[in-house]
Structure formats: structure tokens, C-alpha cells
């Protein structure tokens, strides 16, 4: 990029307008790269001119810049270039950097910097990197950064909605329709043409530029001889999705007396949950709308008893192995076709599979190679910008009416109860980010910038996280299902303070 920017100024084959546009695109790419570095490592060397190579490699050594200066560079670059980028790209350049993309990067980078400034005081990190500012930003800078986020987000939300961008919506209030609408937003069928994507990465199988998301993540029984089962969402995430009436999302396994609740189908326990849950995650008993149809079957085992209490016979292997038990002459499967064992095999160990981004139009997952998927990947979308501004406003304790409207735009599209002014809290905004942006590569970085990753999972952090499974059991006497929770047999996650700056 630095070489390009140096040489484009002297070329005579481009007009000034063309030079300005191409320079802005190159500077956007450079700012994106620096954002990827600073969010991982803190301050890095800022190199904005070509390096001169010689036989002495020490001439290439450059000291780190401060974390604050790198964030300031990214924000300043976006502020300088966004007006040189087109508001709407032509069809032959629609996936290149636009005005909205530069504004979205400005919004996100400023929000990250504001959080790092505000919350880094909880860390006990010491040493030269801290004292020199290579890591950590002064708390006094937090307000400035949150204000920058508010400014960038407001240009998009006030000046470009609905003329350029709008939330992808359905007029229906039906849960299934709302769930399908949310799934469609990220689907291959829509292919990014949803009015909400600000910047996306497109793929082209015919040009040998595909990806392998579907090969890696299709549910077990639909994978043919493919791989599948790559992501097993945890019960902790499922329960973050509220009920449509706005009540807490914890699932009802037992009644107020402590008695197990029986359900006709494993799917019934999720009734009236936030429709985004159904659009994001395949749940036990959920209809599968891709090739093959049917339902997701994840059963932990069978019970010979009453009211969820009795002798349990549990799955001990993955679904295509022997998981059967004979009781009083009748043979029962102790596993569903999509899993049930917590310890071994490829199938989900939690009872859930990821639906968001999976291509349900793919005709056959058998023998799909590593580059046969082409669902686009979203980098920036309007939903994030609403949540960025809402968070910045709450952090500033300013513009709270705008924050309330922003979060209710997201909740309204989802089809769940809107918040009142008294319900608008930082915790609510953060939860909304967790469910709205699930699987879009935000959560890990959000926890890092809030300086919560090193905390124990019981305190909202990553340390000691293993992920809880939801375990449906089929009662052979009643023909109904009861639920328990379980812990998959996998390693505990650890995150120490030094991991904030190790990538």
C-alpha cells in the first residue's frame, strides 16, 4: 500500500479524481490491516512510507508506536478518506471500499479504543510495554473515543439510512417468519443483497475462490461422507436469547416445585424464544430446511421411569455407531441421528449446531471439497452500527434517547419486546450484541476490549469455560422428553492477563 500511494501521485495516466478514489481505497485497506494488528497486539510500528531495503537489516527495525497512536491513526485515516469514497458503488465495484465502510471502521475502532481506555485499569499488567504505552490507553481518553464512535455511527444512521442502508426486515410477526428472515439475512440465497451489509467478502466457486464453511459445519446426519459438526454452540449462548416477551432466556427444565417438566418434543422447550435463536442455531427437534429435510435429532438417552426420574441409558458413541438398548424386549436408540454423546465422536457435544451462514440451498454435502461454498462473509453491517452507537451513548451517559431507539430498532426487527428508558443499561446493550452478532467474530474481541476475558466464566469471562450441553431424555413410559444439563468432555479454556496482547 505504501508503495502504491507513493507512485500513484506521479502517474500521468489517471485523473485527479481517479487518484483520490484509488488512494482512499488503499488507505482504507491499510487502516483495516492496522486495526487487525492493534486489536491483537496493542501498539505496533506505524509505517506509512515505503521502506528502503539495504544489506543492513537493522535499517528496517522500527520501534513500536503506542496503542493510542495506532488507534488514532486508524480513526484519522477514516476521517480523511470517507468523503473520497463513493456512497454507492457501481455494479462492477460494489464489493470495494465505500464511504459506509470507512465510517464503519471508524465507528468500530473508536468503540474498541474507548473500551480499552476505560477498562484497562482493572488489569495488573506492568513492565516496559505498559509504561511506554505500547499497551494500554489512558482512561482520560475514553470519552473522546466514545464520542468519535458516536460521530461516525451517526453519519451512517442519520445521513445514509434508509437512502443507502436499511435493516433487512419482514412485515410478519410470526416467529417462524421472523426466524427465517434473520437466517436469510446471512444466507447464500440472498447473497449479500439485503440492504444491510456495508462491507462484505464475496466468494466465487467458478473462479476457484470458494470456502469450506458448509463442509465443516453441516449437522452430523446431513454431512454424507463430509466432515461437518465444526461448531457446537453452548447452552450459555442459547439462554442469552430472551423470550419474546422480554423475560430472561433461561430454559424451563423444572417447575417451581423442582419436578422435571415433560415436553412432547425436544423443540417445545424453546417455544416463544427470540426468533433470532431459531435463525442462528439448529436446536434439538428443529426442522432442517436444507437438502434431506426432516428434523435435527439430538438425544442424550432414554429413561425407564416416571417424571424424568428412573434408570437412564445414555449414548456412548457418535450416532453412526452402536447406541441401542433393549428394555423389556423393545430396542431403543440412545442417541439421535445428530448426536447425544458428550465424550467421543464428531457430532455436536452440546445438542446444538450453528445455522447462521450455512447454505441450505446446497444440493448435496457429500464429497463437497474445500472450495465449494460461496456464502458471503459480512465485515460490517448496519445492525452493528446501531449497537455501536447505543453502547457509546450509554458509556457517555449522553444521547440516551438515541441509544434507546437504536437498540429497539434491533429488537423490533427481531420481534421481541422493546426496552423502556428505565431498562436501558450497559448490560442490556452488551447482551444485545451477544445475540444479534453471534458467530460474526465479535464476541471474543468484545470480551477483550471490556477487559473481562481473564475473569472466571461465572463472572462473565472466558477462564474455565467449557460450554454446557442441553440433554434431552426420551421417557419410554410417557413418550415425552425431559431435560438435564451436562458438561462435554473437553479441555477447560484459560485466559490470563497477558493474553490480551498475544493475538
Map each language-model feature to its residues.
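Long, intrinsically disordered, low-complexity segments
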Residues: 73-75, 132, 139, 158, ...
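Short, flexible loop/turn elements at secondary-structure junctions
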Residues: 50-53, 89, 203-205, 281-284, ...
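An aromatic- and glycine-enriched ligand-binding surface/loop that stacks and positions planar moieties
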Residues: 44, 48, 100, 110-328, ...
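Conserved, well-structured interaction surfaces
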Residues: 1-41, 57-99, 266, 271, ...
